[in-house]
Amino acid sequence: MEKVTKEFLAGRWKHEEWSCELTMFNFLLIEWPMKIRGHGSWKLRGNEVILTYVQEGTRDRMFYIFSVEEIVDENTIKTKDAEANKIEILKRY
């Protein structure tokens, strides 16, 4: 598999349950249905992506970790949720 880069991941990505924007400066905006939002940062470690955020209206710091298993094309990646050990798809939008 080709190496995942920060430049490739920067942008807006859609998951079936949430969407996010990853900036080149490691800022993160994450959104869920019902207009729930979170703000934080993201980090690339090898092929592993670590999202750290605080949901609006809360003080709890949350983490979501996934690995990029395959770059299908420039707009689609297969990921593996580190906690659930489940393959999922992220699409650029």
Language-model regions: role of each:
Residues M1-K14, Y93:
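N-terminal helix-cap/turn-to-beta initiation motif at the start of protein domains
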Residues K14-I50, V54-R61:
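N-terminal glycine/threonine-rich, aromatic-flanked beta-hairpin/loop signature
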